[in-house]
Each structure stands twice: as C-alpha cells, then as structure tokens.
Amino acid sequence: MVSSCCGSVCSDQGCGQDLCQETCCRPSCCETTCCRTTCCRPSCCVSSCCRPQCCQSVCCQPTCSRPSCCQTTCCRTTCYRPSCCVSSCCRPQCCQPACCQPTCCRPSCCETTCCHPRCCISSCCRPSCCVSSCCKPQCCQSVCCQPNCCRPSCSISSCCRPSCCESSCCRPCCCVRPVCGRVSCHTTCYRPTCVISSCPRPLCCASSCC
C-alpha cells in the first residue's frame, strides 16, 4: 500500500535510500537515509538530516545548526552557535557572544556583544568595541580612545587624547607632542611619568609633577 503523505514513490515501510525523490520530502519521510539535495526543504530540517549536502538556505533551522551545515547560506538568526562561527558566517546578524572566534573578528562583527579579548585585532577597533577587555596596542586607534580604554598598553601616539588621560594611561609617549599642553597634559594626567623635557608647559606644573 502506498503512503498517502509521501507520494507514489514511497512505501508504507519508510523512506529507503533508493526512494528519496523530490516528491518524498515531507516530515514523515525525513529519515537519515533521505538526506539528499532534492530533499532539502524546511519540512525536512530535522536533526537526523543535517548533512553538508542538505545545507541550503531553506534548511537553516535550529535543529540543523551543526559545523557541517555552517555555510554562507546558513548565517541566520537560528544558526548562532559556536560551532557555526566560520569565516563565511561572519556577518553582523551573526555577531553574538557565543560566536566571537578569531575567524569571526571582522569589522562587520565589531559590536558590543562581540568584544572579547580574542577578537581584539586591528580591523575590529571600533568605538563600540572599546571595552576594558579589548584595550590592546593594536586596538589603540583614534576612534578607540574612550575613557574605558585608557590602559598602559593603549598609550601610543594615536591614542593620546584628553579622554584617554587617566592615571593608568599617563606614559611618556603621551607627552611628546607640541600640543601636549592641551592634549596629554590634562588635569587627570599630571603624573611624573608625563613630565619630560619636551613637555615643559605651565599647564603641566602641578604639585605632583614638580
């Protein structure tokens, strides 16, 4: 007797590999043996059917989020899992904390939720990424000079701004420019380490700098 839901090619006994035709792609026929390119439909996206040849855009469901299914076409809201963090899946909509891997550190992924130490690379230095855990020398760009990014490792010439002049960020390299009187020699930057010969400005003559 022919099954009423699986088309004329499927028998009552189940979906054998030789019977997996396009007309057999229904939930009741989605078994491990039925994972073929012609069977990649939303109704067939079950855990037993998550194979590379079934990873099409229509098959990106929560039950199909496996490493073998992480392709460019599978970057959707239902595919945000660590095992899916591959280079082809680095898109803004995929940037969640669980997906912050070295292969996913791209400018499009530089969001607040994706600012982890392992994601601190030069291409990921955006204002939204200036958190304490992301303050590394390679992230000290002009756009990244925020108060919460003023760490000793961030004291480079491009990061010497008033907003970065905190006690932990007052290094000699922040006092070497002629404009240091209004940049590095800020009220919060009166530290002995900042008073060098190239920065003898009256504005720097605080009691702690004498």
Curated annotation (Swiss-Prot):
The keyword Iron does not apply. Pfam families: Keratin_B2, Keratin_B2_2. InterPro entries: KAP. Expressed in the hair follicles. Residues 24-178 are annotated as: 29 X 5 AA repeats of C-C-[RQVHIEK]-[SPTR]-[VSTQCRNP]. GO terms for cellular component: cytosol; keratin filament. One of its GO terms (biological process) is hair cycle. Keywords: Keratin, Repeat. Sequence repeats lie at residues 24-28, 29-33, 34-38, 39-43, 44-48, 49-53, 54-58, 59-63, 69-73, 74-78, 84-88, 89-93, 94-98, 99-103, 104-108, 109-113, 114-118, 119-123, 124-128, 129-133, 134-138, 139-143, 144-148, 149-153, 159-163, 164-168, 169-173, 174-178. Interacts with hair keratins. In the hair cortex, hair keratin intermediate filaments are embedded in an interfilamentous matrix, consisting of hair keratin-associated proteins (KRTAP), which are essential for the formation of a rigid and resistant hair shaft through their extensive disulfide bond cross-linking with abundant cysteine residues of hair keratins. The matrix proteins include the high-sulfur and high-glycine-tyrosine keratins. Belongs to the KRTAP type 4 family. PANTHER family: KERATIN ASSOCIATED PROTEIN, KERATIN-ASSOCIATED PROTEIN 4-6. This is Keratin-associated protein 4-9. It comes from Homo sapiens (Human).
